Amino acid sequence: MSDRNEIVSRVTAALEGKPAPVAIRNARKVDARGERRGYWVVSDAAGVIVAAGTGEETFEHYCRTVGLDPADRNAVIDAEGRILTPGYVDIHAHGAWEKSFDDGPDGIDVARAGHAVHGTTRQVLSLITNPVDVICRNIRTVRATMESGRPDILGCHLEGPFLALARKGAHDPECLKDPVPDIVDKMLEASGADPA
């Protein structure tokens, strides 16, 4: 568990911190066009990819343009031939590593780290059916986490409470509601949206 806690701390710090230049070399790029070996990518201090390709001289040039020493093993990541793909975007997951996105800020940090280490760079956090006040609290927590500067969190997906009893699956029937304006307005207010 201590390894997992260390990963959570590192991932959370990286996501909350200021972007820094990053360079990755010696990767296998895999995308819709196929696979390329010896691939590299360089991003600047704003987190924007400035160049990508193959060829050592060009890699070194772009490293220097963003202030990285291409020989610095602490600044340049050697992918050692591992696959480099665009980051995954997950639009429906409830958590990871024994934590739910309904478990407050710490639960969000742990679950996001669990997804991030497997390549999910952005995520819509799915929240389960609960009493309306709990759902609203969870929406506010997701909103506050996003507003704290977490670019990896795109918003939240509510899996209820507006479900038909006949199709409720594992959802608590006591928490199911009709989508009446009062409840919808409360949820919109919790999200920061104007219910008008």
Indicate residue ranges for each PLM-predicted region.
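Histidine-rich, glycine-flanked metal-binding segment
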Residues: 3-23, 29-85
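Histidine/acidic residue-rich metal-binding segments in metalloenzymes
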Residues: 177-196
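Extended beta-sheet lipid-handling architectures
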Residues: 24-25, 158
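Short, charged beta->alpha transition segments
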Residues: 79-80, 108-113, 183-187
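Di-metal (Zn2+ and/or Mg2+/Mn2+) metal-binding site signature of metallo-dependent hydrolases
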Residues: 82-105
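Divalent metal-dependent hydrolysis catalytic cores, especially in the metallo-beta-lactamase
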Residues: 94, 109-141, 151-165, 191-196
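Alpha-helix-loop-beta-strand connector modules within alpha/beta enzyme cores
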Residues: 145-150, 187
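Glycine-rich phosphate-binding loop of ATP-grasp-fold ATP-dependent ligases
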Residues: 166-176
